[in-house]
Amino acid sequence: LVKTGISYVSEKGAAENLKAELSGWNFEQVRLDAKAAWNKSLSVFQFESKDSIAKQQFYTALYHTQIAPSLFNDVSGEYRGADGKIHKNNGFTPYTIFSLWDTYRAAHPLYTLTDENVADYANSMLAIQQQQGTMPVWHLAGNETGTMVGYHSIPVVVDAYLKGFKISEDKVWDAIKGFKDYNDLGLRDNRNQDYISAEKEPWSVAKGIEYAIDSYSIAKFAQKTD
């Protein structure tokens, strides 16, 4: 058997994580614990059907929604921020893997019904904004890939705020101001001429539609906090 510790901070952090999470060598116990943990996590829904295939498809899809976001800090509370510096979790638990164009429509609204970590997800995005100057677009392991259409951390955070999760109103406004000043990915043209030129930007129509959704979420937040 081989055990591996993972840390985005240090080798010491990886060793401490491994010791805290898996100190023994009982493979069968680890398997049983993992099975029990997944059964508990998937039990947020009770799906009743005589169609066994439909039931399998439902719980497989639910399982897929729970693969990410992923916990990002060491057991010490340290994590590597979007600025490359080591930070300590302060009032929230940091997460990563925010594939937001894929998840903002359905997965994140689902999390507000089923996932106790929603505030941590939102506060992780707000911390990323403070560290790199912009909200995440497609954030992976402390790094911004910038490979998705839209600026969909905004509607995710606004949705969580409007549903009563513990999120700083001031930090949400800071994030919105960052969106207003962000000029990449066609946003400058979208702001200045109300459309995105296909000659200048790929996926121009898709981006225009997605930015309209982002702007609508900003309007809803403003109505709530005005």
Question: What are these model-predicted stretches?
Answer:
Residues D83-G84, F92-L100, Y104-R105, Y111, ...:
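Long, structured ligand/cofactor-binding scaffold of large enzymes
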Residues N117-S124, Q129-T225:
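Active-site cavity-forming subdomains of large catalytic enzyme subunits
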